[in-house]
Amino acid sequence: MAAPKESLWVRTQLGLPPLLLLTMALAGGSGTASAEAFDSVLGDTASCHRACQLTYPLHTYPKEEELYACQRGCRLFSICQFVDDGIDLNRTKLECESACTEAYSQSDEQYACHLGCQNQLPFAELRQEQLMSLMPKMHLLFPLTLVRSFWSDMMDSAQSFITSSWTFYLQADDGKIVIFQSKPEIQYAPHLEQESTNLRESSLSKMSYLQMRNSQAHRNFLEDGESDGFLRCLSLNSGWILTTTLVLSVMVLLWICCATVATAVEQYVPSEKLSICGDLEFMNEQKLNKYPASSLVVVRSKTEDHEEAGPLPTKVNLAHSEI
């Protein structure tokens, strides 16, 4: 216990980061209980440790420092991933390698630590994919089921306001009309109640026999139900299908109306243009005869000579005049 505490105190005096100190403390032989407590949070590094043992076997590398450096690189990567929330694994790898460079001064131990960071990367990616697969995903039919539930709730709330009643109109002897209105009441006949009890007893007696057959029938149903499962699903969930069909039909009708208005040809009737020879064309159409030149009488009026008016008086400037 003294050696890890002394090494931890030395690293603290040297100013190493707290993240690295935590890794070195967990990697020690006396911190197995603490390491197991952090495994559930930081992730499993056993596969990375086995890869380090295969890379640095003790019969080939008699020194244990490189093996421990590789295993600490695995743990460093897990801690960096926990700090960064696993957003970018490439960035986590760079942070792990920089921590290895700060922790080890010898090149062999630095390389072993970097190798541990590299070995932990594929296992971290696999763990991230597994966590993403466990996250709940929204089904494609979830919006339709949501609309169906909303529609059913709205219909139930609307039916709660609807009340049924009986109304009777009677006419008295004096001619007055009397109206009786009351809510319907359900009355059970005694012989029907007795029949219902008999049916209940007979149904209970048949349940034991039907349960044995249902177990076998249910097994056969599961085998044969795969073929008609889609049709059965449609028959059971026809409400939201009808609602969806109605909504889509309304949307298609609106789209057709808008498209027709936008692409319709303008109904423009051009006005008839006036022609200079319109009178002549009219005469030709009506087959009218022209008047001869001798039948035309030219009346000339004698123009009267008018004397021209005299010149206008000269302009007088009122500002220079005295009144």
Curated annotation (Swiss-Prot):
Intervals of motif ATG16L1-binding motif: 263-281
Subcellular location: Late endosome membrane; Lysosome membrane; Cell membrane; Golgi apparatus membrane
Side Extracellular, residues: 36-238
Glycosylation sites per record: N90
Family per record: Belongs to the TMEM59 family.
Taxonomic lineage from the root: Eukaryota, Metazoa, Chordata, Craniata, Vertebrata
Modification Phosphothreonine, positions: T303
GO CC field: Golgi membrane; late endosome; late endosome membrane; lysosomal membrane; lysosome; plasma membrane
Annotated TM spans: 239-259
Processing and modification events after translation: N-glycosylated.
InterPro entries: Uncharacterised_TMEM59
Sorted UniProt keywords: Autophagy, Cell membrane, Endosome, Glycoprotein, Golgi apparatus, Lysosome, Membrane, Phosphoprotein, Signal, Transmembrane, Transmembrane helix
Organism per entry: Macaca fascicularis (Crab-eating macaque)
Signal peptide region: 1-35
Subunit structure: Interacts with ATG16L1 (via WD repeats).
Highest taxon in the source lineage: Eukaryota
Cytoplasmic side: 260-323
Domain comment in the entry: The ATG16L1-binding motif mediates interaction with ATG16L1 and promotes autophagy.
Primary gene name: TMEM59
GO terms for biological process, alphabetical: autophagy; positive regulation of autophagy
Membrane topology annotation: Single-pass type I membrane protein
Protein's recorded name: Transmembrane protein 59
Task of the protein: Acts as a regulator of autophagy in response to S.aureus infection by promoting activation of LC3 (MAP1LC3A, MAP1LC3B or MAP1LC3C). Acts by interacting with ATG16L1, leading to promote a functional complex between LC3 and ATG16L1 and promoting LC3 lipidation and subsequent activation of autophagy. Modulates the O-glycosylation and complex N-glycosylation steps occurring during the Golgi maturation of several proteins such as APP, BACE1, SEAP or PRNP. Inhibits APP transport to the cell surface and further shedding.
